[in-house]
């Protein structure tokens, strides 16, 4: 059985991924834990965690806690992200920075933290799904 962590798990793409992973232990991250628990109540081995992945210290603490609990995580799927669908000249700098916090910086931090554990273990896979 593989242990797979998926970010952005309340979105449609993650919901489709989970359907393809019925035998795996899943760690599903999203902003709204209650929504995650409703979506994945029928998956026998899903742990739903509400977290803001732009909160660097919370992410760092979570990664350490998960590795203590599970020993290893086989696959990281960086699925969290969003786009801004407005006229380009109407997008504010604040919106751009917020989007990059989720789509780029949070992805890089989680990849760096979990990648270090995977490198130490000599195995692991990271899948990045990006939005812009």
Predicted regions and their residues:
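The beta1-alpha1 cofactor-binding region of Rossmann-like NAD(H)/NADP(H)-dependent oxidoreductases
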Residues: 51-61, 93
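Conserved glycine-rich Rossmann-like NAD(P)H-binding loop of the short-chain dehydrogenase/reductase
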Residues: 23-37
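Conserved glycine-rich cofactor-binding loop
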Residues: 10-11
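A short, exposed helix-loop element centered on a Lys and neighboring polar residues
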Residues: 111-112
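Residue(s) in the substrate-gating loop at a strand-loop-helix junction
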Residues: 131
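Substrate-binding pocket helix/loop in short-chain dehydrogenase/reductase
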Residues: 87-88, 95-97
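Conserved NAD(P)H cofactor-binding loop of Rossmann-fold oxidoreductase domains
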Residues: 79-84
């Amino acid at each position: 059985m593989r242990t797979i962590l998926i970010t952005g798990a309340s979105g449609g793409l993650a919901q489709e991924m989970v359907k393809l992973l019925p035998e795996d232990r899943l760690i599903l991250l999203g902003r709204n834990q209650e929504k995650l628990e409703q979506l994945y109540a029928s998956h026998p081995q899903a742990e739903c965690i509400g977290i803001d992945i732009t909160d660097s210290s919370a992410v760092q603490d979570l990664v350490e806690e998960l590795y203590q609990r599970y020993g290893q995580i086989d696959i990281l799927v960086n699925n969290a992200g969003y786009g801004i669908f407005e006229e380009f000249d109407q997008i504010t700098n604040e919106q751009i920075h917020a989007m990059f916090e989720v789509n780029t910086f949070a992805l890089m931090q989680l990849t760096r933290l979990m990648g270090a554990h995977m490198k130490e273990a000599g195995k692991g896979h990271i899948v990045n799904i990006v939005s812009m």
